[in-house]
Amino acid sequence: MAQRYFGTDGIRGTVGETPMTPDFALHLGWAAGRVLLDQLARGQSEAHNAARPCVVIGKDTRLSGYMFESALEAGFAAAGVDVLLVGPLPTPGIAYLTRTFRALAGVVISASHNPFADNGVKFFSQYGQKLADAVEADIEAMLDQPLVTAGADALGRAKRVESASGRYIEFCKSTARLPEGGLRGVHLVVDCANGAAYQTAPEVFRELGATVHTIGHAPDGLNINLDCGSTHPEHLAEEVVRRGADVGIALDGDADRCIMVDAAGQVVDGDQLLFALAEDRQQTGTLAGPVVGTLMSNLGLALALEARDIAFERAKVGDRYVFERLVALGGIVGGESSGHLLCLDRATTGDGTVSALQVLAAMARREQSLAALVAPVEKCPQTLINVRIGRGAASTLMAAAEVREAVQKVEQDLGNKGRVLLRPSGTEPLLRVMVEGLDADRVDRHARALADVVERSAAA
């Protein structure tokens, strides 16, 4: 059954509109706290901090984060759960600290790459992994119950963890496994998207020996992801060329994704980085299982991996589905074109800083530039058009006769040298129209024609 609030990456929306209101966040904290305590009582939760169950709450740099932090804190306290507040910290840092502190769960206040007017709440399990669908369903069911405050002697307590950033920085450094000399002599430009990694990411690379210049490192609560970060790598590319840097690293607002730029200012996306991670592990004898991409992964990635006898599988779009497929197939590396990359031999969730370190380590081991490392991936032309639709209308539109007929015509024209994909966004009222093939003009023409058909059908 479809969930009312939880999407593919937690709960998300416009601040001040349901469900992103302070009263909802208060109730959400209480409901989640009750569900987690019930799990603990039933013996379904192993990790808890001594005699006082706790959760870790972190956030990115959005102005609204303060409001939701306070509301969630109050909700958990009302349920009788202690709260560890870690402040602005990358999403994967909260996953790591959840395990470190043996908390019942981790809670992240962020809307990832979205603008400041949006925000969201997502949860990590005690193991630092995305919360299971069944637990999210239990939380939604608990939201239907009236909020009942625990007794005055059983209320949760809250405290700030001053060592959170330092702990996370040390964790990131431990995953690098660089050759002797670390990153000495490497010149980096790091774009922190005015987001959660503005303090941690530059420090990680500096402490490993790199020369680091930063952009997008002055958050004011309103400028997160604003013309910067992984969704706007063109500014990073300009800075890399201007400074004569070796590599540029672009994170997003909550720093769970990473896009890179080579020394010539060419953007290197998640598909190309995923190839580099997979080939490096193959050469070091540490690759296990297939590499997992998504339905949106470029055909060029699949062909490059095939040429190296590396198995490739596609999952539904969303890092949680990539994770599930990796676990099911015994794989360790996977990801999305957007830069959500999973290195399960290093971390339990996507981590932009850790992913960048893995690529830099591969460059050092092979004594190659970033451009040379990803050169085997010859990307096929791909056009993606987002069509705004009514909420819940995606299934009806995709089943509409005129849409299906248009898709069939394009597929017949492309034959076995291209792909067509229509899929709804998991977080926004959009239907994504993607066409991929060998000829850029033909691909673009087909994508625009399909998008027009979808728009007309949506307006009918």
Residue spans for each PLM region:
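Short glycine-centered, acidic/aromatic-flanked micro-motifs in structured strand/loop junctions
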Residues: 57-60, 190-192, 262, 345, ...
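Buried hydrophobic positions in well-ordered alpha/beta secondary-structure cores of metabolic enzymes
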Residues: 9, 57, 94, 107, ...
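Gly/Ser/Thr-enriched, mixed-charge loops and adjacent short helices
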Residues: 1, 43, 119-243
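An N-terminal, well-structured beta->alpha segment
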Residues: 1-74, 78-79, 158-188, 394-395
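Phosphate-binding and adjacent anionic-ligand microenvironments
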Residues: 246-247, 283-460
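N-terminal small/polar loop signature for handling phosphorylated ligands or for N-terminal nucleophile
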Residues: 38-48, 54-118, 203-261, 409
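General beta-strand structural signal in soluble alpha/beta enzymes
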Residues: 6-7, 57, 83-88, 108-109, ...
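Proline/glycine-rich low-complexity loops and linkers
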Residues: 93, 137-170, 174, 263-337, ...
